[in-house]
Amino acid sequence: MKIMRFIGIVFALFSAGSPSDTSAQDSGKKYKVYMVSNSHLDTQWRWDVKATIDDYLYNTAVQNLALLEKYPHYVFNFEGAVKYEWIKEYYPHLFERIRKFVADGRWNISGASFEANDPNMPSSESFIRNILLAQEFYKKEFGIKSKDMFLPDCFGFSQVMPTLGHHCGLIGFSTQKLSWRTEPLVGDSKTPFPIGLWEGVDGARIMVALEPGRYSWNEFPEGDLSANEELAESARKSPFGIAYRYYGNKLANGAGDHGGSALPRSIQLLEEGITNGKGPVQLVSATSSQLYEDYMPYGNHPELPVFVGEMPLDVHAPGCYTSQAEMKRYNRRNEQLADAAERSAVIADWMGAVPYPKEALNDAWKRFLWHQFHDDLTGTSIWEAYTYSWNDEFLAQGQF
C-alpha cells in the first residue's frame, strides 16, 4: 500500500476553477461541509426480510416523505434498488410520491447497487451485475442513474472497487466503517485521508470520502450549526477546507440499522444554518454524490491525495468470511451457474436457436444477488433470516 501525494496546493488555492474557491468566497465562508442524510436499513440482520418489508421499509418511506414535504432544504439519500422494488410492489402509493421527490432532486437514489453488497466475496461479474441491474431499474422507474458507491457499513474494501466502479461509470465512494479499525491503516491513521482519490488495480480512480462520521448521528447541538467547531475541524483536515458528513436515522431500542429518518429538530437546525448561519462553515444539504460532482474532472485537482491499495477492516470482518459456510457455498454455486447460463444463452442467441432470455436470467440474478448484502452473505444475520436466504439461493440455482 502507498499514498501518492501530488504537490499542487498552492496552485489550487489560487485557481479560479476550483469549486471550493468560488463557493467559499461567494458565500463568505471559510469551510464547506456536505451534510449527507441517509437512513441505513439492514435488509436482514437481527431480523429477517419480512420485518424489513412489513415495518422498517414502510416507516422509512413514510417518515422521510413527511420531512421532505415540511423542510424545503432537506435532501434524503437511500440506497438499494431491491428496496425500491419492494416499495413499488407493497406500497405503490408511497412509490409514486417518491417519484416526485426524485424528479425534484431531493430524494436521491444513492449507491448504484441492487443491494449494499459485501465488496470482497462476490465475483467481479456479480459486482458489476449488482450495479447493472440497479441502474436499469433506476433508469426505467425514475429516468436517472445513480452516480456513486454508497457502502457505509460494509466490512472492508477491495482495491478492485475503483476499477469496477469506474468501469460502470461511477465517480465516488463513501464509508464510515474504517473508523471501526483497531489498528492504523496508514501511518497512525485508520484511513488514508478524509477525502481524496482511490486508485484501482488498473489505475482507474474515483473520489472517496472516508471519514464521514457515523451514519446514525442525528442529535445536532443547539445553536448555529454553521459555527459548530466539530464540523469546522472536520473541514480543516481536508483539501480546500471541505468535509463530507453523514447524518441520519435515530436508534430504535438502543440499536441502529432499522431505517427511519433524521430527527426533525436536527433538520430544523440544519435549515437555519443554511439560511441564516453566521459561522465560518457553509452547510450544504447534499446528495451522496454532490461532492464528487463538484470536483470533476479530478485531473484538475492535483492537490487531492491518492491512495493505492486495499482498505480492510481488522475487527469482526475476518470472521465474516468463514461463518455461515453453506451460504457462501450456495452463493458461489449460483455465480458459476449464472456464468454458464449466460454463456450458453448468448451462444444460442448468436446461432439463431433461441432468443436471449433477458427477463428470466435477470430474475435469477436478482434472486440471489440481494443476498450478497453485507449482513447476509457475510454470515452475521440471525438464524431465521437464512431460511429466506437459502430458499432464494436454491430457487436461483433451479432458474439458471
Q: Which residues does each PLM region occupy?
A:
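Boundary at the C-terminal end of the N-terminal hydrophobic targeting segment
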Residues: 19-24
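N-terminal secretory signal peptides that target proteins for export/translocation
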Residues: 1-2
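Bacterial N-terminal signal peptides
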Residues: 5-16
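Catalytic-domain carbohydrate-binding cleft regions of carbohydrate-active enzymes
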Residues: 25-400
